[in-house]
Amino acid sequence: MSKRALISVSDKTGLVELARGLVELGWELLSTGGTARTLIAAGLPVTEVAAVTGFPEILDGRVKTLHPKIHGGILARPTPEHLAQLQEQGIQPIDLVVVNLYPFRETIARPGVTPAEAIENIDIGGPAMVRAAAKNHERVGIVVDPASYNEVLTELREKGSLSPETRRRLAAAAFAHTAAYDAAIAAYFQRLMRNEEPFPASFVLSGEKVQDLRYGENPHQGAAFYRLPAPPPGTLAGARQLQGKELSYNNLMDLDAAWNLACDFKEPVVAIIKHTNPCGVARASTPAAAYRLAYAADPVSAFGGIVACNRPVDGEMAGAMTEIFLEAVIAPSFTPEAMAILKSKSNLRLLAAGERAGCRTREYQIRPVSGGFLVQEPDYHVLEPESLKVVTARKPEAKEMADLLFAWQVVKHVKSNAIVVARDGVTLGIGAGQMNRVGAARIALEQAGARAKGAVLASDAFFPFGDTVELAAGAGITAIIQPGGSIRDEESIRAADAAGIAMVFTGIRHFRH
């Protein structure tokens, strides 16, 4: 009796070549719908599943393979009892199942797709066959990825059958395939129901490997980069690398931090990042001007940094960036002139992320902890000027207010405890990741130096004492923005009034760990 392969695929890549190879090896082909039509058009002998089951496809193709003559043929073990039952029921064994599933993830990635369209692309029969074959991998081969076709054909030609090790490996890939598929469906429905249940009882997460990384944060740590199902344009996972060396784990961490910061602004902004903290951020009328200001904010730290711009990189900005060593640049796009200039920096990694809107579509932030993970909403809070509360005798002037709002937007992207000193839409000093707030302020003010005179200061959380205000006053800071809410707020307010500093409370905290 010849061996039988059941083939039913949405992705027709390599289909005809695989099927022809199986026929040449003497295999009988079973197939359904569009797959069968493709094989017949290629001149290959095919038995349609309906001829095996004696039952036609029904319900617009929703029911094709859900039949004992199919699943019995897949699930039967090579035992005398099972083989006898197959013979009694007139069922022939199926030895190889080649299935990939309806393009659900591709469907939900389309702009404007409706729930009805998404639901129609939820495969039922396909996952059932995949799981059945994977469960019975002791006897049955299961192939879900066209990239495996050549390997399978080669082994069948050389050995006549698939080894137990190969079948086990293919089964593992098949179970991962259906798990990721179901996870994408679950995530889609969670998204639809998010207003009713923002944190579901079961949180499903899956990813598709983009690439193995050379190592993790350190050379002794392994690492890989995974993409969530159907990432929208404007995200790091959806970005295209245009040139440069292979991305590292640390590159990706810094690129994400830089891109999220730059995209938080509507006007042209450039952010330069080191170890996920900004070292220079500036807004200006053009990308090139913003880059020069961001670089000048801290040229020492900018060396070897990651740059993000929320506007297309043009030739002028590209030329400015060639003057120092940078690890990577991410932007919506790069003009042809910019690409021609940056080509001389062949190791510089360039990423085109597409439209900026996508970088604010992250639904959850997920952090691993021992034995589990934490989930929270992203910090996308936008501060409205009218919500600010002036708590000092002096109100901020218009120019000070503009700088306060700029510094406040930057400080939420700095590791806590965080202090940002800024003036004219440029950061002058950033104190990040300190165990006490006055220590963060001291770092930011020392970095700003004489430039702190006439500048503003932003704090990601309230001042527990008046010492930070006193330190700011001594450096010449004229206005402060902070959440407020300390039991000693009056101490900070008195210190500000004594120095003639304008201070506003936001009522919102921006801790970042």
Curated annotation (Swiss-Prot):
Annotated GO MF terms: IMP cyclohydrolase activity; phosphoribosylaminoimidazolecarboxamide formyltransferase activity
Residues annotated as domain MGS-like: 1-144
Keyword set, alphabetical order: Hydrolase, Multifunctional enzyme, Purine biosynthesis, Transferase
A Pfam family hit: AICARFT_IMPCHas
Cellular compartments per GO CC: cytosol
Coiled coil: none
Pathway recorded for this protein: Purine metabolism; IMP biosynthesis via de novo pathway; 5-formamido-1-(5-phospho-D-ribosyl)imidazole-4-carboxamide from 5-amino-1-(5-phospho-D-ribosyl)imidazole-4-carboxamide (10-formyl THF route): step 1/1; Purine metabolism; IMP biosynthesis via de novo pathway; IMP from 5-formamido-1-(5-phospho-D-ribosyl)imidazole-4-carboxamide: step 1/1
GO biological process: 'de novo' IMP biosynthetic process
UniProt catalytic activity: (6R)-10-formyltetrahydrofolate + 5-amino-1-(5-phospho-beta-D-ribosyl)imidazole-4-carboxamide = 5-formamido-1-(5-phospho-D-ribosyl)imidazole-4-carboxamide + (6S)-5,6,7,8-tetrahydrofolate; IMP + H2O = 5-formamido-1-(5-phospho-D-ribosyl)imidazole-4-carboxamide
EC number of the protein: 2.1.2.3, 3.5.4.10
Record-linked SUPFAM superfamilies: Cytidine deaminase-like, Methylglyoxal synthase-like
Family in the record: Belongs to the PurH family.
Record remark: domains: The IMP cyclohydrolase activity resides in the N-terminal region.
Classification via PANTHER family: BIFUNCTIONAL PURINE BIOSYNTHESIS PROTEIN ATIC, BIFUNCTIONAL PURINE BIOSYNTHESIS PROTEIN PURH
Identification of the protein by name: Bifunctional purine biosynthesis protein PurH
Biological classification of the source: Bacteria, Bacillati, Bacillota, Clostridia, Moorellales
Gene designation per UniProt: purH
